[in-house]
């Protein structure tokens, strides 16, 4: 029996309070309005950005259904939807691509003005919500809310992908892989023969390593305080791995000594102000580029000496690896299907959706790279 046009009751992981476990609740998911799409979720990755919300470092309205890295199948569409249809395999896009705003029309940028990232309302683009739990409205997260068996997104925030793609793997293209890989190949534009430093070896950091290798970097120095991640980093392309706790001097000084004055490209993939500064300082003062990839704590500022940039350094950041989401995600999935890169090494744990709290515990303890939840 078709569910199109009807309210669907399903299970979702609701965050009612900060620093508390998720609660698996029965929620009602309203049908999609015009230019919206309702998706049956198949697989969702647990990303550090979701944990930043739980810990209070990333602010979004509560109660909320988190999750933003996922893949699923279109259940139904609202009036006027033309780019996807029921039955299509899709990836929701936490960075939409409306194609009409100033940012979308700029070939060098991807931070579409329809996003709900910078000053989140916790709604879809029309300012309303599609989730309720026992009659209480529940907020959306960055327009996608993938920790639910069903979700509703705007049409400009979903991409149709190859019908043969394995959703439990390509879900990582919805955030972690694309964010890291694109930061190297598209944002920094790593050059052949260059030297790179990558701070943080989670799923996104390892994807940066993969991007540096694909771009032809000669040296890729991986930096993390968890030595258990070094073997995986080397498997994916790191030429050296170092632990800042093994040195008495600041890690940026160690890296400068290792690289004749500094690396060509550095990446901060943790979200800490101290490592952002170390990443900037370790790149060469005359020609280095440092990229902020990790999500920084809310409402905290860095103070720097402008001379660090005057000498020739470049300091930049990007969301989603600089990729324009709706047009790039299908291409990235096609590249995966053509075996241009593998995602297997990034997925360390697969758990049923109901064990979401266990998955977050694995992330917090550093025992997982990516945990994928299956529905």
Curated annotation (Swiss-Prot):
Localization terms from the record: Cytoplasm
Catalytic activity: a primary alcohol + NAD(+) = an aldehyde + NADH + H(+); ethanol + NAD(+) = acetaldehyde + NADH + H(+)
Residues that bind Zn(2+) 2: 98, 101, 104, 112
GO terms for biological process, alphabetical: retinoic acid metabolic process; retinol metabolic process
Known EC number: 1.1.1.1
Consequence of changing residue 350 to V: In allele ADH3*2/gamma-2
SMART domains, per database record: PKS_ER
Modified residues (Phosphoserine): 23
Residues where NAD(+) binds: 200-205, 224, 229, 270, 293-295, 318-320, 370
Single Gene Ontology MF annotation: ethanol dehydrogenase (NAD+) activity
InterPro entries: ADH-like_C, ADH-like_N, ADH_Zn_CS, GroES-like_sf, NAD(P)-bd_dom_sf, PKS_ER
Annotated GO CC locations: ciliary basal body; cilium; cytosol; nucleoplasm; plasma membrane
Residues where Zn(2+) 1 binds: 47, 68, 175
Transmembrane segments: none
PTM sites of type N-acetylserine: 2
Cofactor note: Binds 2 Zn(2+) ions per subunit.
Family: Belongs to the zinc-containing alcohol dehydrogenase family.
Other comments on record: There are 7 different ADH's isozymes in human: three belongs to class-I: ADH1A, ADH1B, and ADH1C, one to class-II: ADH4, one to class-III: ADH5, one to class-IV: ADH7 and one to class-V: ADH6.
Self-association and partners: Dimer of identical or non-identical chains of class I alcohol dehydrogenase: ADH1A, ADH1B, and ADH1C.
Functional description taken from the UniProt entry: Alcohol dehydrogenase. Exhibits high activity for ethanol oxidation and plays a major role in ethanol catabolism.
Protein's recorded name: Alcohol dehydrogenase 1C
Organism field: Homo sapiens
């Amino acid at each position: 029996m078709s569910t199109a046009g009807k309210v669907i009751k399903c299970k979702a992981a609701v965050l009612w309070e900060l620093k508390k476990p998720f609660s698996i609740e029965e929620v009602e998911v309203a049908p999609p309005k015009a230019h919206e799409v309702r998706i049956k979720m198949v697989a969702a990755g647990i990303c550090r950005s979701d944990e930043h919300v739980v810990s209070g470092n990333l602010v979004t309205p509560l109660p909320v259904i988190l999750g933003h890295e996922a893949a699923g199948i279109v259940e139904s569409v609202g009036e006027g939807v033309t780019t996807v249809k029921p039955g299509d395999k899709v990836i929701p896009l936490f960075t939409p691509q409306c194609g009409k705003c100033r940012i979308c029309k700029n070939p060098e940028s991807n931070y579409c003005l329809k996003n709900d990232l910078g000053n989140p309302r916790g709604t879809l683009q029309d300012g309303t919500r599609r989730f309720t739990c026992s009659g209480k409205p529940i907020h959306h997260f960055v327009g996608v809310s993938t920790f639910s068996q069903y979700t509703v997104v705007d049409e400009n925030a979903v991409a149709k992908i190859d019908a043969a793609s394995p959703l439990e793997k390509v879900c990582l293209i919805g955030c972690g892989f694309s964010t890291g890989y694109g930061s190297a190949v598209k944002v920094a534009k790593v050059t052949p023969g260059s030297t790179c430093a990558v701070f943080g070896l989670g799923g996104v950091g390892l994807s940066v390593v993969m991007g540096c290798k694909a771009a032809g970097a000669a040296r890729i120095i991986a930096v993390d305080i968890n030595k258990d991640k070094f073997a995986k980093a080397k498997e994916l392309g790191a030429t050296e791995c170092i632990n800042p706790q093994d040195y008495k001097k600041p890690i940026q000084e160690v890296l400068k000594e290792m690289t004749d004055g500094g690396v060509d490209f550095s990446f901060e993939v943790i979200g800490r102000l101290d490592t952002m500064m170390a990443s900037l300082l370790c790149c060469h003062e005359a020609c280095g580029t440092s990229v902020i990839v990790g999500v920084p704590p809310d409402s905290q500022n860095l103070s720097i000496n402008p001379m660090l940039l005057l000498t020739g350094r470049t300091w930049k950041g990007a969301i989603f690896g600089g990729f324009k989401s709706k047009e790039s995600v299908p291409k990235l999935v096609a590249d995966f299907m053509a075996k241009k890169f593998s995602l297997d090494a990034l997925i360390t744990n697969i758990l049923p959706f109901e064990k979401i709290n266990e998955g977050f515990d694995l992330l917090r303890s550093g025992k997982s790279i990516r945990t994928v939840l299956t529905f």
